Amino acid sequence: MRGFWANRLIDLHPIRCYNNLDFERKKTESGGISMKKGNPIALLPIGVFLVLYLGLGLWFEYGLHIPMGFYNIPIVIAFLVAILVACLQNRSLSFDEKLELMGQGVGDKNIITMLLIFLCAGAFVGVVGRSSAQSVAYFMLHIIPPKFAVAVLFIVACFVSTAMGTSVGTITLLTPIAVEVANASDFAVALCVGTVVGGAMFGDNLSFISDTTIAACNGQGCAMKDKFRGNFFIALPAALGTLALVLALTMGRDTAPIDQSYNLIQIIPYVLVLIGGIVGINVFVVLLMGIASGAVIMLATNQMAATDLLSAMGSGAGGMFETSMVAILVAAMCALIRAHGGFDALLYLIRKLFKGNRGGQLGMGLLVGTMDIATANNTVAIVMANPIAKEMSADYGISPKRAACLLDTFSCIFQGVIPYGAQMLVAITACAEMGVQISAFDIMGYLYYPYLLLVSSLVAIFVIGEKKK
C-alpha cells in the first residue's frame, strides 16, 4: 500500500509537484519498486528547523548556561519558520495550492486520531494525578524487601511508565524516591537515578497511552496491540538483562525500610488502563474507562470536588496542546516536502546505503534516531519520520507493525541517552531539588536499559528477523 500521501498527490493532478527534477527509475532489492532521485533542496526546511531548534538550544544550554536552556526554544515557532521556508520553495505551485497540500496533510485520518488520543490521554493523567502514580510506586516498594531497592526502582519505573504513558512524568515522580534509596544505603545516586530513567523509557516505548506509541501506530497504520506484541519481545530481553545487571551490582547490600503511605484504591485506574490496553480494547474505550474510574474514585474519596475534577481534566488535556500543535505543523511541513520531492531524495539515499529487508529496518531505526538527536523529542522525531518510514515499509517489505515497533524503539533508545533530552534534564533538576548535584554524564554511565535495548533491537533485526505470516 502506497499510503495516504501517494493518493493525495494523485488527487491533485494536474498540479505539478516537481519542477525540473531528474528522476531515475530502476529496480530495488525489495522487488522492482521504482526509485526517484528527488530534490534534495526540498529538505531545506528540516535543516532550517534543526539550526533553529538544535543549534540555538545547544547554545542556550552550554554556551549561555541557561538551566534547561534547550527547552527554552519554542518548538512551534521553529516549525513555523520551517514551513515558511517550504512555502517559498517550488514556484510552480501557487500559495493556495500549497495551502491545499498542507490542509490535506493535516486532515489525514491518522493525524486526527492521534490528536484525539493525545487529548484523552492528557485528560486521564489530569484526573488521576500524581498521587495515584505515587501510590503505585510506594505499594510496589512496600511489598518487596528493601535490599532489592534498586531493582525494585527499575520494576516500579517500568510499571508506572507503562501505566502513565509518560517517561518524564515517571522520572519526576520516582527520582526523589531514587535519591531517598541512595541516601538510605551506599548505592550511588547516579545508579539509582539511571535505573529510574531506564525503566521510564521501557514504559514510554510500550505503553498504550504513550504519545510515541500513538504516533508510531497511527502513522504506520497498525493496531496498538500488534505493535505491543512485537515490541514486547524486543524490550523484554533488555529489561531482564538490565534487572540481572542491577541485581549483580547491588546484591548483598542492605537498605533502610522506605515507609511511605499509599492508597490501593487509587491504583485501580492505572490497572484498568494497562489491562485494557493489553487485551486489545479500543484505545478510546480504554482511556474513557480510566477517566471514568479515576473520576469516580476522586469524587468518592473526597480528594476532588466536581469543579476541581473538571479543571484537572482541562489542565491535563491542555498539557497536550503543544504536542498536538507540533503534530499538526509537522504534518503540514511534511506534505510540502513530499510534494517538492524531498522525501524521494532521502529515500534514494537510504536505498543506496541500506540493502535488503534487514538493511531497511536498520535504516529506518537510524532515520528516527537522527531525527531524535536533532529535536530531543522522540514524539516529534516519530511524527517527522512517519511519512518517510511509510515509503520505506513498502519498498523494503517491512510490515506496518514492525515499522511502528522500530520507530518507537529506536526513538526511545536515542531519547533515553542524549544528555540534553527532557528525561535527563528533569532527572537532574529533581536531584538538585533534593540537594544532590549530579551531571547528565554521571547518569549516562548507568543507563543500562537503553544500551541493552539497542543490542536487543539489532539482534531482532539481523539474527531473528521479522516473522511473516
Which sequence ranges carry the predicted segments?
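Core transmembrane alpha-helical segments of multi-pass membrane transporters/permeases
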Residues: 72-80, 84-89, 98-132, 147, ...
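Juxtamembrane helix-boundary/capping and inter-helix hinge elements in multi-pass membrane proteins
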Residues: 91-94, 107-109, 186-190, 215-227, ...
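Membrane-interfacial loop-to-helix junctions in multi-pass transporters
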Residues: 108-114, 138-156, 182-192, 236, ...
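Hydrophobic alpha-helical transmembrane segments of multi-pass integral membrane proteins
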Residues: 114-125, 145-177, 353-390, 395-396, ...
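Interfacial loop-to-helix junctions that mark the boundaries of transmembrane helices
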Residues: 36-38, 62-76, 104-109, 141-145, ...
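Hydrophobic mid-bilayer segments of alpha-helices in multi-pass membrane transport proteins
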Residues: 41-54, 69-91, 112-120, 151, ...
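Juxtamembrane and boundary regions of transmembrane helices in multi-pass small-molecule transporters
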Residues: 37, 198-201, 205-261, 265, ...
